[in-house]
Amino acid sequence: MDAIRNGNFTSSEIFRLMKSGKAKGSWSVDAYTYIEECNRERRLGRSIEVVTDARPLSWGKCVEKRAFDVLGLEYTLCSDVTIQHPTIPFWLGSPDATDPIAVSDLKCPLTLTSFCQMVDPYYEDHKLVHEGLTIEAVRENHKDGDKFFWQIVSNGILTGRKKGKLIVYVPYYEELEEIKSIADGNPDYYWIWSADESKLPYLIKGAHYKNINVIKFDILQRDVDALTTRVLEAGEYLITV
């Protein structure tokens, strides 16, 4: 992970600042915990995060290459680039992709349960009907829905985009061979390359679900203002080392 992220607020964790406490207008315990974690990283000069189960992360990194092949050329993959807010230096993010009007976050869940929780509200009679719904369905239906929402809002602010996209991808069975080819030779992905196909998440082509699901929404000014205000307030608690 890019060292510049250490000790700063990042899009992937910024949802923690938006949690409210029990009293009206108060902050949650998790918000204060996040600020303290950033301060510890500042004192340590390194990340305090220790990944105990790297498989969900490595699956996502491996499979995103295939996902963007499926999505097409309108998207620019930028997940390895860290963007800093132009006037708030302790606010950073690494969006997965951008296109001319939107910023996108790609989710490649390792479990089919997580996939279904994200996309089920957008299906009706075996048809994808997400155009008539909003990101709110994910926020209500998935345990990390609020995290996904604020991550995209944050990256929208950092990239100057007014629209967000949550892209949810699970490969069809026929795509697993290509994914194993991507994994071949990379020690981080060895478990993917060596796994029996039945042990990997995949969909049956022509059944209920599509492999690519794009959920679009407007990034509202009220959310931009609320997040910006909260980041600035939280920044007052960051130490200088």
Regions inferred by a protein language model and the residue ranges of each:
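Charged phosphate-binding loop/patch that engages nucleotide di/tri-phosphates or the phosphate backbone
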Residues: 228-241
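Compositionally biased, intrinsically disordered low-complexity regions enriched in proline and serine
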Residues: 33-35, 76, 238
